[in-house]
Design a protein with these regions (language model features):
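Charged, low-complexity intrinsically disordered terminal segments
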Residues: 1-180
Length: 180
């Protein structure tokens, strides 16, 4: 947060001298924040998503309004399906960008041929950005599953390791699938 402020306006220094508040330990959820953007040296966001896909053992569900991954992520999704992981991609049937819709659909044939299930949500413009890995790890935030989010935009996401939270995300995903 402070870093983003200082990038936008280097004269803002009040955040640099303040310690963050102590984190509450209520609810029993373990969560980890990660940020990315063009000024960060490492592609941390990309690495986290790639690792999540490669670590999936049983089931992986991705929900994104904009789907335009690079070849590495496509290969990881197809490899996950090939090793028996149930991989589901939920995208909007109608997109607010025709170009993005065409681009997204260009990946579908290879993914479906490898065993990835693609569900087109028809209940409006789907804007959820999430991954649910083996019903036990959730990743959500501002990042779309596309090159703009992965390489150009400032994004923030949260990884949550909590069965209760993952169960709620699973119910939300099920509601999307019912409308697909």
């Amino acid at each position: 947060f402070a870093f983003d402020w200082s990038v936008d306006d280097p004269s803002i220094t009040s955040f640099k001298d303040r310690e963050p508040p102590a984190s509450p330990h209520e609810g029993g959820a373990l969560a980890q924040e990660f940020s990315s953007g063009p000024v960060y040296r490492d592609d941390i966001l990309y690495q986290v998503l790639l690792s999540a896909i490669m670590d999936a053992r049983e089931e992986l569900t991705i929900t994104t309004p904009y789907f335009g991954p690079d070849d590495g992520l496509i290969q990881a999704l197809m490899a996950a399906a090939a090793r028996g992981v149930r991989v589901t991609l939920i995208v909007p049937k109608l997109n607010d960008s025709t170009l993005v819709a065409w681009s997204s659909k260009s990946f579908y044939e290879d993914l479906m041929n490898s065993g990835v299930k693609i569900a087109e949500f028809h209940g409006g413009l789907l804007h959820t950005k999430s991954l649910l890995i083996d019903k036990r790890i959730a990743i959500f935030g501002s990042v779309n599953f596309d090159q703009r989010s992965l390489r150009l935009n400032f994004e923030i996401s949260l990884i949550v390791y909590n069965d209760n939270f993952c169960s709620k995300l699973e119910k939300l995903i099920e509601s999307y699938l019912e409308q697909s």
